[in-house]
Amino acid sequence: DNPIVKGCIKAAPGHKIVAMDLTTAEVYVAAVLADDKNLMKVFQDGGNFHSNIAKLVFNLPCEAEDVAEHYPTDRQAAKAVTFGIMYGAGANKISQQVSTDSGTFFSKTQAQEVIDDYFKQFHKLKKWIDLSSKFIMDNGFIYGATGRKRRLPNVKSDNQGIQSHEVRSGMNFLVQSVA
């Protein structure tokens, strides 16, 4: 979005330059892999993704385009949960992220409530995450959508931090091998 950079780039006659925001591409891939129609619909409806999520999760009494102005902390919480759950963040991490990004204290309890509300809306995503994580824990590997196998041998470690890292790596692999 830098105007100086944009001014340096010109399309050839008869052509157009298209800019794309792919920051939510991995979330869409997860929605498709989980077959979560509710989450896919948020993408299909267009508009600002995180505002749409916040309106849906918090049942906000405004139009999605007004969420950022009237409910900035809720929007930030929805954004933090959307990206956080993709990478294994729990209530503590999401609490810290929302507090930092919004400049407003957001407790661990509030974060857990948002996570719970998020998964009420997107229950198929939750089921997919749970089943995939269990498969990784049980087998020490996971197959991506294209059939590629990712070995995660340290998932059987006695160290909980190492186990969690392996599960996160496996979940990241599932999404990033397609995105």
Question: Where are these predicted regions, by residue range?
Answer:
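Conserved catalytic core of nucleotide polymerization and phosphodiester-bond processing enzymes
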Residues: 1-179
